[in-house]
């Protein structure tokens, strides 16, 4: 691509709301988009890990993408995750995302039959990206879920040569040293988005501008404050605010992360429903304990300040 757009802000990894029977609650999506817009979010990552993309059917993923894009196009940057265990199905999702008006696409590595090398991964991503040649393509690096890890910088060196629409990486791993290398590769040519919310301040110190995160759905104002303090050179205030974010994340991840975060959304007035098996919603006892712990650190009070 001739010009790569560099993200400066927070992109929320959107949850997919479900009805009690497990069907997708499409009607709630516009309200979620409005909520995120009001919190200062810059974009939405659709049908990723947080959105239970791998647990949705192809048709459901397409309909979710259409509904979210329709609700927020022109106001928020729309990145559709198209990763799938089948490269052919991922390519279909990529083509659909382009037709639906997405601003970019992203894909994880195949997670059943895994790539055998960096070159093999690049070949897979080349096939997927070709499904939407008019959209920027981001490789989604999340080894904790795909079970596949390799040198991301080596991947970028290959991808820039054989993927015409390669734009960058969604880097969701705690290896900040490698993230820094990727971020500054070729003078910072590519848009490398950081995906570990609890490392947001360290990532900023390395030069990060854009980030994609799950807790941005309900805690964006806290992270935006971190950024504000950091950019103003008020490092102690940034550290203090970031420590609160870390404390919040620590509470949430005591429980299965996606069900727990859906529970937090319910506490804020957005009933996201259950999760798709094998994920399950928090039992009432855990829901109440999560609420108690968040209340104890002043989460709800601070959010309303």
Regions found by a protein language model. Give the residues of each.
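Active-site beta->alpha loop and helix N-cap motifs at the rims of alpha/beta catalytic domains
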Residues: 2-148, 304
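A general structural signal for well-ordered alpha-helical segments in protein cores
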Residues: 29, 61, 65, 90, ...
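Structured C-terminal cap/extension of enzyme domains
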Residues: 38, 201-305
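Short secondary-structure boundary segments
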Residues: 48, 109-110, 173, 196-197, ...
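Surface-exposed amphipathic alpha-helices with a cationic face
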Residues: 66-73, 95-98, 129, 160, ...
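Short catalytic-loop micro-motif centered on adjacent basic/acidic residues
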Residues: 78-81, 167-171, 212-213
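Short beta->alpha linker loops
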Residues: 82-85, 173-174, 195-198, 218, ...
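Ligand/cofactor pocket segment of small-molecule handling proteins
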Residues: 104, 110-116, 121-209
